[in-house]
Amino acid sequence: MATTHPRLPHDTTRPPACSWRGLLVDSARTFWPVPTMELLLTVMARYRFNVLHWHLTDNTGWRMRVPGYPMLTAIGGNIPRQPSDWYDTECAPGRKGSWRLTPAHSTQGFYSDANIRHLVNFAAARNIRIVPEISIPSHAGAAIHAYPHLGNPALVNEAPHGGNQTLWPSAASLSFMEAAFHHACSLFPSPTIHIGGASTDWGPWESDLSLMRAGLTSGAAIERLFIDRALRTLHFHGRRAAAWDSLTRAYPTPPPGTTLLAHRPGNAGRRAAESSGAPWILADADILTLSHPGRTNSPLEPAHTLFDDLTQALRGERLKGVEAVAWSASVTTPDLLFYHLLPRLLVVAEAAWHGEDSLPWDKLAPLVEQEMAHLRRTIPYWNPQRP
């Protein structure tokens, strides 16, 4: 990327309003090669983001090696993209059906230990720390597809996009989970590791008589079994956890040292985080999910709407920062990724640094337009006029 002085945030001689200025990048659903990750980090650094939340595991992809579990990447790293028309409602205008044309390799691959260490160092040189996410106990479908005994024993023959996506409370699953977090701690120096904690369907656990007879009498208790073991592993390495706000279903008061990401829509995530007593990050799905395109003919209108909503939302006790979110279920190529991120990521940068002292929109909009002119010359950016 050509070096020019960034216009946003508008005054970085002031201290930042948010200590956590993050972007979630989803490499589980679409595998982003190392050069794409480098370019993302370069863009983040330009606008003073300091946390890359790296979503590395989910139902449709497992992207990091775990010693002793070679099938994680051999099988879990090569799950075909789900052929479903629901993508069409999520894609940018004019990209209907684009998932059908996406190259097969977009869901194939994993990051070697050397790749990860390189990107950690690349990020650190730009004042960014990488916070990896290993999703437990739900959103584990890729791991279960590779090792079916980790999931529900009644669903061992389910397809990878089927319902067997939650770790089963067994010695094998707990050992696997520990191995994954031990290895993550060896690769990522971040003091915080994200453990997932997204909403888990407790029904299969609670309806299993053998689990009930073993004394595992509620979904909340079983989820705590997984989370407590993960935290014990992190604490062994001197780390602490971040988790989605859904963790409060099992822990109304989260374990000490845990940071929550308030993500559930309709203010549910915010309410859970605010009432938890834990420090929290605003990652509101209604405001900050940039992989949902703004449905408008004006390129700046979605950025304007986001800016108005965000500057009002960045208030609250124990609020430590803000995180934009880019899921990759329907974002399948680098040009489409940057199309979704920009220009809205620029207004997140301004609000994250300046908070209530952000420029008013009439002064901010020209700077956004100038930055976009620069970015379109230097990064892959989908042109809606030439789909």
Residues covered by each model-derived region:
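Feature activates predominantly on carbohydrate-active enzymes
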Residues: 1-164, 171-174, 182-192, 233, ...
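Structural preference for beta-strand elements that scaffold enzyme active sites
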Residues: 20-24, 51-53, 127-131, 166, ...
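A cross-domain feature marking catalytic cores of carbohydrate-active enzymes
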Residues: 25-27, 56-58, 132-136, 197-199, ...
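Flexible loop/turn segments at secondary-structure boundaries
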Residues: 31-33, 59-65, 137-143, 194, ...
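Generic recognition of stable, solvent-exposed alpha-helical segments in well-folded globular domains
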Residues: 39, 111-118, 172-179, 222-229, ...
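Active-site neighborhood of glycoside hydrolase catalytic domains
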Residues: 143-257, 264-277
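Flexible, acidic glycine-rich loops studded with aromatic residues
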Residues: 241-258, 263-387
